[in-house]
Regions:
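Flexible, acidic/Gly-rich N-terminal and inter-domain linker regions that tether
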Residues: 1-58
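Conserved, mostly hydrophobic/aromatic
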Residues: 4, 32, 60, 99, ...
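Generic structural signal for well-ordered alpha-helices
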Residues: 48, 86, 113-117, 140, ...
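Core AdoMet radical
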Residues: 67-82, 89-110, 115-116, 120-180, ...
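Conserved C-terminal portion of the radical SAM core fold
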Residues: 123, 155, 174-234, 242-262, ...
Length: 286
């Protein structure tokens, strides 16, 4: 994998099925750490994440902010709130702002344009990353022309049948992938990603994820363990494995050597040193 940067489907399944072997996981982590340090040195990239809304029109079965969750404590930040976060972040040394929210129709496309332009006016040296779900290609283009640099849209699973078990029928796995290709075509630096250990996922599904990422060639890949959320159909499902998530980070680093690979929030949620373990296994963003 380190040499060829891809595997055949059956090779992936064999490798992923061996995740229970601690020596194999440690070997993969050591190789991935060497690759990461060879490409990036010991630098870790720090991002300022602003979660500005947890309203969402979608009803994904795993997500705590799904529209049908009556227990979600909803909030929205104003443009002034967000700009205040950016000001504080800039003073602290953040140079990338990640604006993340649910697919919330309260904010119009024009509002995003104004926000992006204002952040860029105040902090012309910053990078703006958006993570606000599936939109039209025209909307993506408008935001890019306003100054947005990057876009994060997790594909969640590359297996279409698996996708349909985690989302209501009005959501399309094909459309989600089309959004990622449209974002790349427009010129964004693009991030995709998936949950590790989601219900119904096995080596076959993870193999398809690795193949899709190899084909897409994203600039960033965000993965994290599945964490059951209260008030969702998957609330009582088993949490994703820390060991498998760390292993997947290592394999991603070996396949996509120059990709930006975060040690995500969910890793820190399931283990107090989860993020540090992710960095030791090839991640390079927090």
């Amino acid at each position: 994998l380190e040499k060829e940067e891809c595997l055949e489907r059956e090779e992936w399944i064999t490798l992923l099925s061996a995740c229970g072997d601690e020596k194999l996981r440690d070997y993969a982590a050591q190789k991935a750490r060497t690759v990461a340090q060879g490409g990036f040195g010991t630098d870790i990239y720090v991002r300022g994440l602003i979660e500005f809304s947890n309203y969402c029109k979608n009803d994904c079965y795993y997500c705590g902010i799904r529209r049908s969750n009556p227990g979600a404590d909803r909030y929205r930040l104003s443009m002034e709130d967000i700009l205040a976060c950016c000001e504080e972040g800039w003073i602290l040394g953040f140079r990338t702002f990640v604006l993340q929210g649910g697919e919330d129709g309260f904010y119009r496309d024009e509002w995003y344009e104004e926000l992006i332009r204002e952040i860029k006016r105040k902090y012309p040296a910053c990078a703006i990353t958006l993570s606000v779900g599936e939109r039209t290609k025209e909307t993506y283009r408008r935001w890019y022309e306003a100054g947005a640099d990057r876009y994060l849209l997790r594909h969640e699973t590359a297996d279409d049948a698996h996708y349909r078990t985690m989302h209501p029928e009005e959501m399309s796995p094909v459309h989600r992938k089309e959004c990622l290709y449209a974002l790349k075509e427009i010129g964004y630096q693009v991030g995709c990603g998936f949950m590790v250990g989601s219900p119904g996922q096995g080596p076959e599904q993870l193999a398809q994820d690795m193949e899709f990422i190899h084909e897409l060639k994203p600039h960033m890949v965000g993965i994290g363990p599945f964490v059951p959320a209260a008030g969702t159909p998957f609330a009582k499902e088993t949490q994703g494995s820390l060991e498998l998530t760390i292993f997947m980070l290592s394999l991603l680093r070996l396949q996509e050597k120059r990709v930006l690979l975060p040690a995500t929030t969910a890793l820190g949620t399931i283990h107090p040193l989860g993020r540090e373990m992710g960095i030791q296994a090839g991640a390079n963003v927090v």
